[in-house]
A protein has these predicted regions:
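Catalytic-core "active-site belt" of small-molecule-metabolizing enzymes
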Residues: 1-56, 99, 109-115
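Short glycine/threonine-rich loop-to-helix capping motif typified by GTGT followed
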Residues: 91-101
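A conserved acidic, glycine/proline-rich C-terminal tail/linker
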Residues: 59-91
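Short amphipathic alpha-helical surface micro-motifs
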Residues: 4, 20-22, 65-66, 83, ...
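Short, charged beta-turn/beta-strand-edge "cap" motif at the junction between a beta-strand
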Residues: 88-92, 106-109
Length: 115
């Protein structure tokens, strides 16, 4: 399955609004995915931490599951599609003016603000 994935990249799901992609793109074989950690800060305060192993033991498992579920319907994941493997942190409430920093260690750090 990993051979079919060009890269992995951190993402934050803004519930019912979209996603924020950040950090750096990494080939799946170049990082031990279950051990990727995250620290999410809101206005400088740590709100959530997590480990990618919290997504079915390995985020790639969820992507493989999705590919298998689509196949009987004649559907498949297409090149260039963004696939979210699942969150390993809980949602954090946000309001206008809140500034977030997401630190994914070897996959990089990025910031975003609600306006």
């Amino acid at each position: 399955m990993l051979a079919a994935i060009d890269f992995v990249q951190p993402a934050i799901d803004i519930i019912d609004a979209g996603i924020v992609l950040g950090g750096r793109r990494v080939r799946p074989g170049d990082v031990d995915l279950p051990w990727v950690g995250a620290v999410l800060r809101r206005n400088g305060v740590v709100e959530e931490t997590g480990l990618a192993a919290g997504v079915q033991g390995d985020p790639a498992i969820g992507v493989a599951w999705l590919a298998r579920k689509l196949a009987p319907w004649g559907e498949r994941l297409q090149a260039g599609e963004v696939v979210l493997a699942g969150s390993f942190t809980r949602p954090v409430p946000a309001q206008r003016g809140d500034a977030f920093e997401a630190d994914y260690g070897p996959l990089g750090r990025f910031t975003f603000t609600f306006t």
